[in-house]
Amino acid sequence: MHQVKLEEAEYEWDQTIADVDIVIHVPKGTRAKSLQVDMSNHDLKIQINVPERKVLLSGPLEKQINLDESTWTVEEQERLVIHLEKSNKMEWWSCVIKGHPSIDIGSIEPENSKLSDLDEETRATVEKMMLEQSQKRTDEQKRKDVLQNFMKQHPELDFSNVRDQI
């Protein structure tokens, strides 16, 4: 989790290649009806209305989100957890809100993913690349086998320059 402490807000956030999760600690006993969470594809505004009205987090998002897949919930009446589904599931965010402290996305180590985690189009592309790579290895091995067989059948020929290519 990346911790962000600002004058007006304090939150923690983490991400995968597909989503961003934000955790904001709220006063114990906070219920969902005392919060106002406004999300759009590009902006986020979180306000608590009890005991007095206060904006907890507000501003333009680092990147666009899929609003229909993004959610929020209050956990144990003390944590607001916001789940943002990234529109582009192939890029890392350096921050949640533009202008807030950023992280070095070059140092992120992604978790291993499975083909089943990918969307249909990406999965098809990866499977095609894997098949082509496998076919290339098979073709190379066949060529090496044919050459080695030929060399065995013709020991009278000089293959000294060919050995480096096997």
Curated annotation (Swiss-Prot):
* Molecular function GO terms recorded: unfolded protein binding
Q: Where in the cell is it found?
A: Cytoplasm, Cytoskeleton; Nucleus
Q: Which UniProt keywords apply?
A: Cell cycle, Cell division, Cytoplasm, Cytoskeleton, Microtubule, Mitosis, Nucleus
A single GO CC term for this protein reads: cytoplasm
Under Pfam families, the record lists: CS (PF04969)
UniProt cross-references to PANTHER family, sorted A to Z:
NUCLEAR MIGRATION PROTEIN NUDC, NUCLEAR MOVEMENT PROTEIN NUDC
Q: What is this protein called?
A: Nuclear movement protein nudc
From which organism does this entry originate? Schizosaccharomyces pombe (strain 972 / ATCC 24843)
Q: Quick one: which gene encodes this?
A: nudc
